[in-house]
């Protein structure tokens, strides 16, 4: 995916950036920085100036159906309005023309990994917040899982760990790593700086709608880069060989 002067004024200034196949990229920044706007623009869901390219083709040249085959998008919030059961909701997200037995295999795999195997018949409106978040994650993953969708290229997730407990976050991290190994680019709007420091391959840092830094994680997740943007004095500590970003004591 490439962004070429892509903007949604005044929320997102013209932006040039790219995410490579098989890369896990995190978008970070303070609240109101434009992270969700950038993700929705990259998904083709917000109009604006400039262009977003996917697999070398401008999003504007894809039909809605063609785009849905190539990328999946998880919004930060989405109420479960339908009365349908979980398995039917997932059916609506499976790739067209996929072999039914192959889809069933992936559904079982994803449901097991995200601890939902006992929820398939439950109506969406009877799910807890964490269950609904995991159901939505399975739907997004199912839409672009490469073994059943050879056209898949990109997964866009806005705050995917909302309402997840620690074990569920670990399970999601493992699935995203596996998806990247299969060649899918994954872009995540994130709020936990240490999680980004430990898991992202590359990071985009936004401030007031401007992409102020982008690059390898170790080059962006530095106190001197983060502190001016967040307005907090950060320092870096190394514990058991891992870098941790913490606030400086008063």
Swiss-Prot record:
<keyword id="KW-0813">Transport</keyword>
<dbReference type="GO" id="GO:0015420">
    <property type="term" value="F:ABC-type vitamin B12 transporter activity"/>
</dbReference>
<keyword id="KW-0067">ATP-binding</keyword>
<feature type="binding site">
    <location>
        <begin position="29"/>
        <end position="36"/>
    </location>
    <ligand>
        <name>ATP</name>
    </ligand>
</feature>
<keyword id="KW-1003">Cell membrane</keyword>
<dbReference type="Pfam" id="PF00005">
    <property type="entry name" value="ABC_tran"/>
</dbReference>
<comment type="similarity">
    <text>Belongs to the ABC transporter superfamily. Vitamin B12 importer (TC 3.A.1.13.1) family.</text>
</comment>
<dbReference type="InterPro" id="IPR003593">
    <property type="entry name" value="AAA+_ATPase"/>
</dbReference>
<comment type="function">
    <text>Part of the ABC transporter complex BtuCDF involved in vitamin B12 import. Responsible for energy coupling to the transport system.</text>
</comment>
<dbReference type="InterPro" id="IPR027417">
    <property type="entry name" value="P-loop_NTPase"/>
</dbReference>
<feature type="domain" description="ABC transporter">
    <location>
        <begin position="3"/>
        <end position="233"/>
    </location>
</feature>
<dbReference type="InterPro" id="IPR023693">
    <property type="entry name" value="ABC_transptr_BtuD"/>
</dbReference>
<keyword id="KW-0997">Cell inner membrane</keyword>
<comment type="subunit">
    <text>The complex is composed of two ATP-binding proteins (BtuD), two transmembrane proteins (BtuC) and a solute-binding protein (BtuF).</text>
</comment>
<keyword id="KW-0472">Membrane</keyword>
<dbReference type="InterPro" id="IPR003439">
    <property type="entry name" value="ABC_transporter-like_ATP-bd"/>
</dbReference>
<dbReference type="GO" id="GO:0005524">
    <property type="term" value="F:ATP binding"/>
</dbReference>
<keyword id="KW-1278">Translocase</keyword>
<dbReference type="GO" id="GO:0016887">
    <property type="term" value="F:ATP hydrolysis activity"/>
</dbReference>
<dbReference type="GO" id="GO:0005886">
    <property type="term" value="C:plasma membrane"/>
</dbReference>
<dbReference type="InterPro" id="IPR017871">
    <property type="entry name" value="ABC_transporter-like_CS"/>
</dbReference>
<protein>
    <recommendedName>
        <fullName>Vitamin B12 import ATP-binding protein BtuD</fullName>
        <ecNumber>7.6.2.8</ecNumber>
    </recommendedName>
</protein>
<keyword id="KW-0547">Nucleotide-binding</keyword>
